[in-house]
Regions:
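Transition-metal
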Residues: 1-141
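Short, structured beta-strand/loop micro-motifs enriched in basic residues and often containing a Trp
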Residues: 148-156
Length: 171
């Protein structure tokens, strides 16, 4: 088969913290005022990306990988992750603060969720003046401090935050 750039139908997700910038900046076909995410490539169960055009139109990414594993994933990825696409590509519009999330490592994710862990990489395409990225808890945080701050509704004080601006990259 002659391969071509595969594009997928975006999977749009409403979030309480979302907005309309996915339409403004990326011309996404959103109708909600709270669209927070556009999943571009996903193998998350119940949200599997479907090819948008070409000879593979209508096939989902898992079907394409089953037909052409090495061509799509490459030998190194197959050796490490099997015939599964190990990434989730998405655009985010965070009009409001996102929820605090804990992402398990690969071992815990496999044990409890039958999936891979979640390491995040961010590239900032646009940022409002006060925009910031939360990169975890401050180094001196501990369980007792967390529980205390949680009770007082001050958990945000324990977070390590960095200002962001357009074209910034964080991993």
């Amino acid at each position: 088969m002659k391969f071509y750039p595969l594009t997928f139908i975006p999977i749009l997700k409403d979030r309480i913290w979302g907005g309309t910038k996915l339409k403004t900046y990326l011309n996404k076909d959103i109708v909600s005022q709270t669209t927070g995410e556009s999943w571009e490539i996903s193998t998350v169960p119940n949200d599997i990306s479907v090819v948008r055009s070409g000879s593979l139109i209508g096939k989902n990414i898992n079907e394409v990988i089953a037909m052409y594993p090495e061509e799509i994933l490459g030998k190194v990825v197959i050796e490490r992750f099997g015939k599964q696409f190990p990434l989730l590509f998405k655009f985010i519009d965070a009009k409001e603060d996102l929820s605090i999330q804990l992402h398990p490592n690969d071992a815990l994710a496999k044990e409890r969720h039958n999936s891979f862990g979640k390491t995040e990489m961010w590239y900032v395409m646009q940022a409002d003046e006060a925009a910031r990225l939360v990169v975890g808890f401050k180094n001196d945080s501990n369980s007792a401090a967390y529980l205390d701050h949680l009770q007082r509704k001050k958990v945000v004080d324990l977070l390590e935050m960095h200002p962001v601006k357009k074209a910034m990259f964080s991993f």
